[in-house]
UniProtKB/Swiss-Prot annotation:
InterPro entries: Cyt_b/b6_C, Cyt_b/b6_C_sf, Cyt_b/b6_N, Cytb/b6-like_sf, Cytochrome_b, Cytochrome_b_C_euk/bac, Cytochrome_b_N_euk/bac, Di-haem_cyt_TM. It comes from Lepilemur septentrionalis (Northern sportive lemur). Heme b b566 binds at H97, H196. The keyword Protease does not apply. Heme b b562 binds at H83, H182. A ubiquinone binds at H201. This is Cytochrome b. Heme 1 (or BL or b562) is low-potential and absorbs at about 562 nm, and heme 2 (or BH or b566) is high-potential and absorbs at about 566 nm. It is a multi-pass membrane protein.
Amino acid sequence: MTNIRKNHPLLKIANNSLIDLPTPPNISSLWNFGSLLGACLIIQVITGLFLAMHYTADTTTAFSSVTHICRDVSYGWMIRYLHANGASMFFLCLFIHVGRGLYYGSFTLLETWNVGIILLFSVMATAFMGYVLPWGQMSFWGATVITNLLSAIPYIGTDLVEWIWGGFSVSKATLTRFFALHFILPFIISAWVMIHLLFLHETGSNNPLGMSSNSDKIPFHPYYTTKDFLGLLLLILLLMTLALFYPDLLGDPDNYTPANPLNTPSHIKPEWYFLFAYAILRSIPNKLGGVVALILSILILMIIPFLQPNKQQTMMFRPLSQFLFWILVADLLTLTWIGGQPVEDPFISIGQTASMLYFSLMIFIMPMTCLIENKMLKW
């Protein structure tokens, strides 16, 4: 059996990636989230496939087809809620995964980090298009507001928006293309995941100490397969609790009202995982400025490796940087809260302050702190 595992052309790849992979012996539970993201992707593809069998991408029947799935399809309600709450689990794992990369300096593995950011953008695009498909009020108006942001692009903006819509407003053409793209993107994401892992296995995993562990590695199986399996069980427990006991906890009640272009909801907001970016968008009173800030709020991660002059890779032994990291986390939580609030004082000023703090921390304060820490350590 060992010979087949190590010599068979296909099994050899799986063996070198999942069984005999040399792994640092000291990686903590925060390194579990990569495998959990893989599990989330598989759950989303399987549940999504079953939903696509019963869904119709037509403005007249989309809403009722989702109702039909929940009422008439065997366990359709469960598949629908697993898919909707699976997206929330996906983003929860994504944010922790990126946060761990920032805290432990994994961004020094440049190729892996950049492919990861492409993955983050792809997953966000997929989730946005998926939110449009049930064709409720928030689906329709969310699609209208977010796609309309592209009209802020000088000269080509209006044409670009109408090209994406397939008409002069969000219509049947928009819904059909969003469904097609929402269906194909997870498979493109799967290909990017393979590239992400390919780059990661070229350099090997980082570890909490940020030091080379080449002289001291252990095989991935059975140590980390067991550890990952425990994480997977906890993820499934949380997902099942959400889907079976609190299925609509993270959703919006407005989405249970069929889309009506003549009636605007009192407060348009995206799903919780986009609220931080939405708050940054709203905090700038200029349309183009808001769109630029929105894109930069994620794209800034790409320049993080060039903004960190620290001599120690991880924040484990750098208390000042640790303090600032947790301020950044608190700031993002504040932005998430603000994104769900109406556009009125004091929420406007809190959002603007939090947005300024977010960019200041990323571009100036954290790099400057790294330099101070280097001086203190006489490096």
